[in-house]
Design a protein with these regions (language model features):
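Conserved alpha/beta enzyme-core scaffold
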Residues: 1-156
Length: 156
């Protein structure tokens, strides 16, 4: 199963950690692939899941921190796939990457999932880079700490 994430919140993004902890520790999922735009030191806890063999694949444009060290040490079950920022959406559109669930961290969202990169406590700008994931994923989950009235407008 492949989960996608975006790094709009940079090193303040703990959505990857929360989702993976719930999927692995609470739901007992395994053989997971992370398709993230980029992974940094905020995502160091994921290194444990790689070492345990729960996360078996990574597709991203960058891996830093402890997770990068674990992957460089050969502990990931399958080779990590590193693509440019433009190569990632192209691979998704071409069907080279299948996303089961796209998780989009957003500063604001309304009750039907219209999300924006502004207006909340953690503005990050345009969420346009997440559009390919949300278009091609089997399921989309918007994660926010600021629920706003419908419609969340204008789009960003």
């Amino acid at each position: 199963m492949t989960f996608s994430f975006h790094h709009h919140l940079r090193d303040g993004d703990y959505v990857v950690n929360l989702v993976m902890a719930a999927a692995i520790e609470e739901l007992g999922l395994k053989d997971l692939t992370i398709a993230a735009t980029s992974l940094g030191s905020a995502h160091d806890p994921i290194a444990d899941y790689i070492e345990q063999g729960k996360v078996v694949g990574i597709q991203t444009s960058g891996i830093r921190g402890r997770m990068g060290e674990v992957v460089s040490a050969g502990k990931l079950k399958t080779p990590a796939v590193i693509r440019s920022h433009g190569g990632r959406p192209r691979a998704i559109e071409a069907g080279e990457v299948h996303i089961d669930i796209a998780f989009v961290a957003a500063p604001t969202s309304d009750c039907v999932g219209n999300c924006r990169g502004v207006g909340g406590k953690s503005d990050c700008g345009s969420l346009g880079y997440a559009m390919t994931d949300t278009k091609y994923a089997d399921h989309v989950v918007v994660v926010t700490d600021c629920l706003v009235d419908f419609p969340n407008f204008p789009a960003s």
